[in-house]
Amino acid sequence: MSGSSFLFLKSIKCILSSSCHGQNTISNTQLAAQYISKPQKQLCETVLKYFDRQYSEELGEQWWNARDVLLNPLSWQYGVLLNRFSDLTNLKQCLAELGYTNLLQQTHPESHSQTADIPLQCFIHPDPVRIPTQSHHTGWLKQYYLLNAASLLPVLALNVQEGENVLDLCAAPGGKSLAILQTATPGLLHCNEVDQHRHDWLLKTLESYVPPSLRHLLSVTLQDGRSIGTMQPGAYDKVLVDAPCSNDRSWLYTPDTHRGEMWLKERTQLPLLQKELLCSALAAVRPGGIVVYSTCTMSRAENQSVVEEVLASYPGVELQELEQQFIDSLSDHFCFAHLHPSVGQLVIPQKGKTWGPMYVSQLKKIY
């Protein structure tokens, strides 16, 4: 058995022994089968060739380094976002003993950036170790949520404070809504999703992690996010637009060539949808409020170009530079791309820092 497989099984034994009072218990034989026999992802050559043409032009050498990581799923790292509303007895100690460290506390402790004092805890490992997800059980709160740690950047950029009214415009499957609740207790967290299946998934996620005593703070809706700004103008202090995008990791492993070709054709329509969602978010936020726009693609057309076009057409909005301390405090673990134009921040996967892609841009509504 390889060292990574041994570490995986050791971590499972440790974590699940203290989980859910036995509800998630599973034999080591089953776990080994789950880990070793997991089918390999099937690469879509059509999408890869398209990405090679586009990203080699937009990102240069940075693309070829990211490409090596994206083509090797066994190298991908996974973050463990802890649920502060659950019983975490022994869990943090177990993770620490296995070599996990807290992403937001392990580097630059002298920094006074906005990450310094928030209760959010995400543990990461230097190796591509992945513990299994926990099963959903009615009435029991899960202890952790597995995610690409770079997906926390939009939530950190949003910088939610106690009692603020927050809108997560495209919320499913719910990881960023959950992360928001780990940073502060909002006065209201409105989680919206337009797709019925993903809306149901969102509901299940919230039920699995949020205690009944706090669910009155949540509003979960099934609406077209493009209409919310008109329906609720100026209603929110902070708005997150984690926009539908050409998810680079997923699209590379599209199940068949025909579907890959279909997605690439649909890709040209995404920037218009993204701009409309961002404009809706700006209408929904109050003057002085913050909107964060994010995607999980490296595409310039879906990232910088969307933000630039909205800034040019929407009066009373300013692009905010993310604090350098904020970037510095995470640079030991995330690789930030050199963007042209320099609008927002983009994390791209690199060897040893396999997090991303994740683009984030922060906007402030002046009036």
Curated annotation (Swiss-Prot):
Binding site for S-adenosyl-L-methionine: 170-176, 193, 224, 242
Keyword RNA-binding: yes
Compartments, as annotated in UniProt: Mitochondrion matrix
Residues annotated as the enzyme's active site: 296 (nucleophile)
Listed GO CC annotations: mitochondrial large ribosomal subunit; mitochondrial matrix; mitochondrion
Reactions mediated catalytically: cytidine(34) in mitochondrial tRNA + S-adenosyl-L-methionine = 5-methylcytidine(34) in mitochondrial tRNA + S-adenosyl-L-homocysteine + H(+)
Keyword Ligase annotated: no
GO biological process: regulation of mitochondrial translation; rRNA methylation; tRNA wobble base cytosine methylation
Entries under SUPFAM superfamilies matching the protein: S-adenosyl-L-methionine-dependent methyltransferases (SSF53335)
Assigned keywords, A-Z: Methyltransferase, Mitochondrion, RNA-binding, S-adenosyl-L-methionine, Transferase, tRNA-binding
GO molecular function: methyltransferase activity; tRNA (cytidine-5-)-methyltransferase activity; tRNA binding
EC number(s) recorded for this UniProt protein: 2.1.1.-
Family affiliation: Belongs to the class I-like SAM-binding methyltransferase superfamily. RsmB/NOP family.
Function in brief: Mitochondrial tRNA methyltransferase that mediates methylation of cytosine to 5-methylcytosine (m5C) at position 34 of mt-tRNA(Met). mt-tRNA(Met) methylation at cytosine(34) takes place at the wobble position of the anticodon and initiates the formation of 5-formylcytosine (f(5)c) at this position. mt-tRNA(Met) containing the f(5)c modification at the wobble position enables recognition of the AUA codon in addition to the AUG codon, expanding codon recognition in mitochondrial translation.
Protein name per its UniProtKB record: tRNA (cytosine(34)-C(5))-methyltransferase, mitochondrial
Organism of provenance: Danio rerio (Zebrafish)
